[in-house]
Amino acid sequence: MIVINMTMKYFLFILIFFSAFSCMEPNNENLWNLNKIAGIDTEGYCRDVYVSGDSVFVAAGQAGIQLWDISTITSPRLVWKRSLSDLGLNKEISQVEYKSSIRQLFALESNERPIHIDLSIPDSVNVLGQFSSEKTKEFRVKTNNTNSFTVYAADNDDGLKSSTFEYDSFYKLWFNTSGNEISSIGNPNGIDIISDLIVLTLDQLGIQAFQYENSIINSLYHIDLPGNARAITISDTDEYYVACEDEGAFKIVSNYPDHAPVKMQFGEDLYVTHVAISSNQIALSCAANGISLYDRISNDNIESRGIHNIGYVYHAEFYNNYLFAASREGLQIFQID
C-alpha cells in the first residue's frame, strides 16, 4: 500500500496546475500574426489569384473572372467582371494568369481547356476563345517575345502539352502556330516552370521534370513522393516545394544529375493544396484549416509559425510584402508580422 503524505499531495497539485495551464496557454512568442488589410467579396468562391502591379486578376469560380485595382490596397476597386455566360463557359474558373508584356490574360475552365483573353486595347475585354485539350488541370504561360507566347499545360489524360501562338500584325490576330505533346509517367495535375525547366506533379507518382532545349522537350528525371502530389512551386532551378495533400508539403533539392534528391517534409499533419514562398516566408494553403505559416530558418530547417483559420483556402500568393489568399470567403489580403 502506497501512502501519500500532505507534502507529496501539495507538490502533485502544483504539478497538475502548471501542466494544465501550460496546455491552455502555449508559448506564442515564435508565432507570426496575420493582419488583414482588405477583403474582397468575389461572389463565387475565389479559386485563384494573380497579381500584376496594381492589378489583381481573380478566378471567381462560378462567378467567372474579375479584375480589381489595388492602387489603394485597403480599398480594392472592381474594374470589370465577366460571368461564365459572358465567357461562353459552363464550369467554374479555377485559374488565372496574366502576362503584362503582351497584355494577354489566360484562364482555365475547371478540368476543361484554357481560355485566351486579349486586354491590349484599353477598356476592352476581348475573349478570343479556348485552346489546347480538355482535362487541363493547370497551365503556365511563357512569353517568347512581344509577338509570341507558349502555354504549357498539365493534361490529366495526355501528359505535358505545349501550344505556341504568334501575333499576325496584318490580321491583328493571334494564331496557334505549333504544339507538342509529351507523355508523362502518370496523369499530371499541376505544373510550374522556371527558365528551361518544367516540372509536373503526378498525384500518387510524385513529380517529373522536363527540360526545354532547342525547341525540344525531354524528360530529365522522376522523384517519388508519399501522398498525392497536388501542386508545385519552383523557387530555384534545383529547389521545389510540393503540396502533397494528406502528407503535408515537401521541400526538394534535386541535385540533378550528380546526386540523389534531398527531401524535407513539413506540415505533415495538415492537408496541403498549395505552397507559396517569399524569401524565408512560406504559406501553406490548407483547405478547411486556412493558412499555415512557416519560417525557412536555413536550408535544412523549416519551423512552424502558426495556423490561421481564415476560412477554406485554395491558393495563396505573396506579392510586394502582402499575402493574397484565394478562399471560399473571397479574396483576402494580409500582412505578416
Predicted features and spans:
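Positively charged n-region of N-terminal signal peptides that target proteins for export
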Residues: 2-11
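Sec-dependent N-terminal signal peptides
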Residues: 10-19
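Feature marking well-ordered beta-strand scaffolds used for ligand recognition
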Residues: 23-337
